[in-house]
């Protein structure tokens, strides 16, 4: 947790408005396992260097730097924010205000596409009956998504038929996809959209993870 807060992960994670707009820890142990993986990469690189040059070296890896590497998308966003003053993929755009640092962004995907977590039909009884859907920027990808969702009218609507337009109308995009998802379970949404090539995944709880044959 300390590495997460010092490396920028907590400041960019969590809800972006209201009483819940506070720095948030990840449920994943970002510092522990990630530091080991980074250290392993460093050791392997040092071994390769020794084989080539005959010289060894000291390998060091901190939890802070390991977590910082995982925040590289957010540091990229900081460079964009410094340059133009706003971030189009964030929920604050176009109507909200941006400060001088990357804000929290809820469940947006964060790298230029419209991703969000949607309630599915059993959400009232199952707190994890949600699905994550990404609406990509490419015209062909968008067309496939519209056909799968039954939103063919979006293909000719200037509010939605370009990526830049969707950035400006993201709340309407999210609301309509929510209407689609709420009629199905997370697994039904995942099966339907994945067949069409739409990036999608169910929110699996810890019990489901333990019994998933793919794990």
Show where each model-derived region lies:
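Active-site-adjacent "lid/gating" segments in soluble enzymes
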Residues: 1-130
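Active-site proximal loops enriched in glycine and acidic residues that flank catalytic Cys/His/Asp
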Residues: 63, 135, 202-205
